[in-house]
Amino acid sequence: MVDSVGFAEAWRAQFPDSEPPRMELRSVGDIEQELERCKASIRRLEQEVNQERFRMIYLQTLLAKEKKSYDRQRWGFRRAAQPPDGAAEPRASAPRLPPAPADGADPAPVEESEARPDGEGSPSKGRPATARRPAAAAPADRDDRGPPTSVAALRSNFEKIRKGPAQPGSADAEKPFYVNVEFHHERGLVKVNDKEVSDRISSLGSQAMQMERKKSQQSAGQGLGEAPRPHYRGRSSESSCGLDGDYEDAELNPRFLKDNLINANGGNRPPWPPLEYQPYQSIYVGGMMVEGEGKSPLLRSQSTSEQEKRLTWPRRSYSPRSFEDSGGGYTPDCSSNENLTSSEEDFSSGQSSRVSPSPTTYRMFRDKSRSPSQNSQQSFDSSSPPTPQCQKRHRQCQVVVSEATIVGVRKTGQIWPSDGDSTFQGEADSSFGTPPGYGCAADQAEEQRRHQDGLPYIDDSPSSSPHLSSKGRGSPASGALEPTKASELDLEKGLEMRKWVLSGILASEETYLSHLEALLLPMKPLKAAATTSQPVLTSQQIETIFFKVPELYEIHKEFYDGLFPRVQQWSHQQRVGDLFQKLASQLGVYRAFVDNYGVAMETAEKCCQANAQFAEISENLRARSNKDVKDSTTKNSLETLLYKPVDRVTRSTLVLHDLLKHTPSSHPDHSLLQDALRISQNFLSSINEEITPRRQSMTVKKGEHRQLLKDSFMVELVEGARKLRHIFLFTDLLLCTKLKKQSGGKTQQYDCKWYIPLTDLSFQMVDELEALPNIPLVPDEELDALKIKISQIKSDIQREKRANKGSKVMERLRKKLSEQESLLLLMSPSMAFRVHSRNGKSYTFLISSDYERAEWRESIREQQKKCFKSFSLTSVELQMLTNSCVKLQTVHHIPLTINKEDDESPGLYGFLHAIVHSATGFKQSSNLYCTLEVDSFGYFVNKAKTRVYRDTTEPNWNEEFEIELEGSQTLRILCYEKCYNKMKMAKEDGESADKLMGKGQVQLDPQTLQDRDWQRTVIDMNGIEVKLSVKFTSREFSLKRMPSRKQTGVFGVKIAVVTKRERSKVPYIVRQCVEEIERRGMEEVGIYRVSGVATDIQALKAAFDVNNKDVSVMMSEMDVNAIAGTLKLYFRELPEPLFTDEFYPNFAEGIALSDPVAKESCMLNLLLSLPEANLLTFLFLLDHLKRVAEKETVNKMSLHNLATVFGPTLLRPSEKESKLPANPSQPITMTDSWSLEVMSQVQVLLYFLQLEAIPAPDSKRQSILFSTEV
């Protein structure tokens, strides 16, 4: 049994009123189990405490509001009258008294005594009460990084004021109630929304703060014992477990040694500054923010009654101390925030679930106060290593809402831009879909770290974006200038842009230098300690970890010192090319750093494991974030900072590209910058291969890596609703995420929906499918209506491009196109792909391609062979993994045509003729068939299926299919074994019971297929080879109705000629085919849609052309799909469509009428105006198609499906009516006008199919129609 000496005695000494718990600790396993039970208990109790604290805060606030006993000025209300001087004294002098709401004491949740009634038991109770924070901030800001006197600490605890029930329609209800202010303990108010206040206000503030200190001294009296200590940045001064963590013993407290590392060798620690004032006392911070014309936001008071209605209560978050102290602790679930908000979109999840207003709240104000240097800061320093160790320490958010706080790296002296300056407005946020120069590669982990550590969030620089607006600043009439003046103005703008690009580079350099400084800061004391008897690291380890960092710092310091004065003394002829050329010539130092990077990281990890003191130091390196604020620093890990140079060098060419873009070729810098770019590109090409694998992995544990294998957008079926998801397959788990809605300027963010370790994942079998819900299918009519809208919008876009109209119209159309394509992508898939977790949960995806489903299943099964152990992720680990997806993803856009680049091939439009010849390589006799898929509208669709070739290892199908292409680029072929005994077959995912034997694909290259000759190819499928021939017919030729050269046949001969020759009202071929299909094809699945064997169709065509009397015998022996194909071919090859070229435009216009009565009258009159042979043949065929549709439950052919098949066949005009170009890969103009035409033809036929009855114009026609001859 394990000896637990001293536990009972220590327990009784600490808790004299309770007996020590009994613990049976017989082995290490017992200790571990007891520890887990203890942790679970802590998590449960902590959650209960937090919930009760949250409820207490709400009730206190509600009580304060109802009794109107709160400190109105502190809550953002204008003080109506100055209270008596003594009003503040009781509040300061009795902070430890228990709450007494009954007698009117202030119950607002800003009093330490109410929020922490157990404060007496803290070992740090010797500290004065005035040094503590208000309780309203305590639950949410336990990890406050700012000084304890920051008014923003109170402000950050309150959400933006929402519309109250008393004024639902208030216009002001959506505006943020608090502004971003900064206070100094001596000077009072120093900044409002990051703008320094005037000297007069500052002097008044200084006087006010002196008065406050005097009040505080009088009221505190002898309550101030010893001088208080300030809070550590990033730490709470009060521990949730009641322990004081600020011991000055260097051996017992590694954090103390780290924070005082430079003075560790005998230097005296500077004295703590006295804290003799009461925080948050008599300070007005309220008011509405109003946009000014290029000025800082103003403070506007509101009426007391209105403000009282809008008083809100604070949100809360969980204390971070539980994460650190309990080894896992309670963590908020990443899929459902614990912040109790009304919208899951208001907060990031998990680690980033900070108590802050919605990002959109401050968006409008942030954009107004943005300077070029601020906008450009995110250039080189934006990325981070895949798993920064600083993220492993789970911290609470900063009290100042970082979304609303834009702190400049460099003082510029002006606010950019103003209301009247629209140069960058709208552009900075509209270019986020593409990499904007050197400013858009920030990964999500880095952005969250900035929020947490105090480094301000800064949008991508408009000055560095390649998508900058060309509008003149303040010159709305610039479009009316003469061409010469306009070109001069453009040149002037380009040179002006050059300055802003350089300003962004300068800001980026400053941030990068601060990171290198943070790396060098611990290096000196570590080297000094290495010579002592108790070194933290050896000299060799220090040299390995910090290899080449001093040299890099010197190089960039010299570059910055040279660039800064030139930008400050700017002129359009200012030269900077020599500086960039010299910087590029020194990239060899980066080569040495990159080569050593892996060794440095490995050494640092080993040192962290071996030395807790160094581990603490390595996770708390301070980098200066704002040179204008003396103590403004951010906390970074050693891993983060060591990755900065690696990330920096991989982006070096982006800066030069942007600079060259705005440097005229006549400028002296142009050639120098080109030379620098050439050097940088050559250098990068040599190291990219080494860096890419590192960026594609994410650290899981020490020495282990989680690799991304595959990712894709899919549709998930959630409680009957379709949801678009992004699925990531890692080496050990399957992760399902949701792409969060992006407000303007925000980078991509993902929410985790669920994950399954691969060891726990399985595919469901047939006996488990009985309880699965049916897949809701979207009617084909709706899908076709969406396609019509998409084609129409694409045509409108092309028209706008040709007209060169304003970008607003184009953006609106592109947004509408994206919405419609996304909806089509969401609604079209119908093939189930189900995954099952060992815990009993199942998830269903809908896929349009069996090829893609098979790929996912193969990838998962292959990886499962390498996974042997189940695991679970904490919500923080899960959040880190989700954040990494932004950088690791390989599929960056939803597969929409709107996301295609302009130079990307639009695909083929026309008809692909494919002959599936044969297959070899099967090991045993099987019943085999093939299916063909092509891509259309961004997803793959099954287009054709061969007949089943029975009991063979070498099937010879030799079947020809005609497949319509709509922007298609790939042809896929899948080979199956037909399984007739379904009971013996493991039926997975609700798919057909047939077994997939192999799959392959071939690219449809317009250059190869444009000569319209047969192209023979062999597709390899892991040992199985399928022989295939393809031929492409472009729209130009497929639209032609070629008349037959001999008028004795029936194909290609006018219908009137055929009926006259046969002395019938309906052609013999039509009657024969319809009769045979109605005899044995009415229950054939996909009749008229499934292609028949091309050789059979050609044989029937020849027989009808020569009037073979045995044709009826031939038809009885042929596949019914070949007979259906023959009938379609006859109508397709008519020299003039059944609806005639003359009436076709009228039918197209009639179907577009909105009034149903007018439409019916128009369409019937047009129909009855057709030539007699055409009308009677159409009515005969129409009656047959309606009978086919009556068997829809069996043959799956609805009226809409039949209209899709026959519409273009019966209505497509002849060549002379077609004005479409010949290029098969012609962009959207031709393809979409054709698509619209096809959709219109389908709608015309569908209209007649849906009409209950079509009256004949006279009795003569009616008698003819129903004559026995027909």
From Swiss-Prot:
GO cellular component: axon; cytosol; dendritic spine; glutamatergic synapse; membrane; plasma membrane; postsynaptic density; postsynaptic density, intracellular component
Domain PH: 707-865
Biased composition (Low complexity): 126-139, 348-358, 371-384
Signal peptide: none
Quaternary structure and partners: Homotetramer. Interacts with PDZK1. May interact with CCPG1. Interacts with HCK, FES/FPS, ABL1, PIK3R1 and GRB2. Interacts with SH2D5. Interacts with DLG4.
Keywords, comma-separated and alphabetical: ATP-binding, Cell projection, Coiled coil, GTPase activation, Guanine-nucleotide releasing factor, Kinase, Methylation, Nucleotide-binding, Phosphoprotein, Serine/threonine-protein kinase, Synapse, Transferase
Function text: Protein with a unique structure having two opposing regulatory activities toward small GTP-binding proteins. The C-terminus is a GTPase-activating protein (GAP) domain which stimulates GTP hydrolysis by RAC1, RAC2 and CDC42. Accelerates the intrinsic rate of GTP hydrolysis of RAC1 or CDC42, leading to down-regulation of the active GTP-bound form. The central Dbl homology (DH) domain functions as guanine nucleotide exchange factor (GEF) that modulates the GTPases CDC42, RHOA and RAC1. Promotes the conversion of CDC42, RHOA and RAC1 from the GDP-bound to the GTP-bound form.
UniProt domain DH: residue ranges: 497-690
Residues the UniProt record annotates as site (Arginine finger): R1089
Chain positions found as Phosphothreonine: T387, T640, T692
Pfam families reported in the protein's UniProt record: Bcr-Abl_Oligo, C2, PH_19, RhoGAP, RhoGEF
Protein name: Breakpoint cluster region protein
Reactions catalysed: L-seryl-[protein] + ATP = O-phospho-L-seryl-[protein] + ADP + H(+); L-threonyl-[protein] + ATP = O-phospho-L-threonyl-[protein] + ADP + H(+)
UniProt region (Disordered), positions on chain: 67-173, 201-249, 295-396, 412-484
SUPFAM superfamilies reported in the protein's UniProt record: Bcr-Abl oncoprotein oligomerization domain, C2 domain (Calcium/lipid-binding domain, CaLB), DBL homology domain (DH-domain), GTPase activation domain, GAP, PH domain-like
Record's comment on post-translational modification: Autophosphorylated. Phosphorylated by FES/FPS on tyrosine residues, leading to down-regulation of the BCR kinase activity. Phosphorylation by HCK is important for interaction with GRB2.
Coiled coil: 28-55
Comment field on protein domains: The region involved in binding to ABL1 SH2-domain is rich in serine residues and needs to be Ser/Thr phosphorylated prior to SH2 binding. This region is essential for the activation of the ABL1 tyrosine kinase and transforming potential of the chimeric BCR-ABL oncogene.
Domain Rho-GAP, residue spans: 1053-1247
Record PROSITE patterns: C2, DH_1, DH_2, PH_DOMAIN, RHOGAP
The species this protein was found in: Rattus norvegicus (Rat)
Residues recorded with modification Omega-N-methylarginine: R473
EC annotation from Swiss-Prot or TrEMBL: 2.7.11.1
Protein's GO biological process: actin cytoskeleton organization; brain development; cell migration; cellular response to lipopolysaccharide; definitive hemopoiesis; establishment of localization in cell; focal adhesion assembly; homeostasis of number of cells
Places the protein is found: Postsynaptic density; Cell projection, Dendritic spine; Cell projection, Axon; Synapse
